[in-house]
From Swiss-Prot:
Family: Belongs to the HARP family.
Protein's name according to its UniProt entry: RNA-free ribonuclease P
Source domain of life: Archaea
Role description: RNA-free RNase P that catalyzes the removal of the 5'-leader sequence from pre-tRNA to produce the mature 5'-terminus.
UniProt keyword Cytoplasm present: no
Naturally occurring in which organism (per UniProt): Methanococcus vannielii (strain ATCC 35089 / DSM 1224 / JCM 13029 / OCM 148 / SB)
EC assignment: 3.1.26.5
Lineage of the species this protein comes from: Archaea, Methanobacteriati, Methanobacteriota, Methanomada group, Methanococci
Keyword annotations from UniProtKB, A to Z: Endonuclease, Hydrolase, Nuclease, tRNA processing
Molecular function GO terms recorded: ribonuclease P activity
């Protein structure tokens, strides 16, 4: 049987869906449960779980520290997750993938520009409708209109430019390391999932990952 390897994104440990699936009440409890399963899978089945260093590792540790996780959990992360920097200079990516990424990025930029233009028109229209000289002054109108428009703009702009694509170095490192190791990608991220498929990588949803490892362990225990 081929050795099983997994490459973890931060969301493999921190995602709220993971906590819910494990019945945990907080990130500290769910992280400890996941790390305990990972450690058993490593010792009993030689299943290795990797994390890109230092991008994703620092992101994960920073999140756990901000959530007040106890030091024992950090130690488990350091012990059972294999930290490795992707060999960015040696990993070969088909040029078609790069072409698709640039094309996708260009389309998102254009969409973001259209959203920006629409937001300007909406702001001007709202200001015109709301402004009543006898009732409101200029600052009141601007504050009322801009706060609403800016909030709507942020949501639409974020979705247009970041939803379903790679928008950070840690995201890319997860895919590069998984390709280098021929490992399955573990995440709850639409962009990582989409580009993992394009690269021909195995993908495991973060909320399913602990139960997949547990299934391996249960089968091993029946031998």
């Amino acid at each position: 049987m081929q050795k099983q390897r997994f490459c973890l994104d931060t969301t493999a440990i921190t995602d709220s869906g993971v906590r819910k699936s494990l019945g945990a009440t907080n990130i500290s409890e769910s992280a400890e449960k996941i790390m305990d399963i990972i450690s058993k899978a490593r010792v009993k089945l030689d299943i290795s779980c990797h994390i890109p260093y230092n991008t994703v590792y620092n992101e994960l540790i920073g999140f756990l520290n901000r959530e007040g996780c106890k030091n024992e959990i950090i130690i488990k992360v350091d012990t059972w997750l294999v930290k490795k920097t992707p060999n960015r200079y040696e990993i070969k990516i088909p040029s078609e993938i790069l072409y698709e990424y640039i094309k996708d990025l260009r389309e998102r930029i254009n969409k973001g520009m259209r959203i920006s233009e629409n937001a300007m028109y909406e702001t001007a229209l709202e200001a015109y409708i709301l402004k009543k000289p006898e009732e409101k002054n200029k600052d009141d109108v601007l504050n009322e209109v801009l706060s609403k428009t800016v909030n709507n703009f942020r949501d639409k702009y974020r979705n247009a430019l970041r939803g379903g694509t790679l928008d950070s170095a840690p995201d890319l490192d997860v895919l590069l390391l998984a390709k280098e190791l021929d490992a399955a990608v573990v995440a709850n991220d639409e962009g990582i999932e989409k580009w993992a498929q394009r690269l021909g990588l195995r993908f495991v949803n973060a909320k399913d990952f602990p139960f997949i490892l547990q299934e391996y362990l249960d089968m091993w225990g029946k031998k």
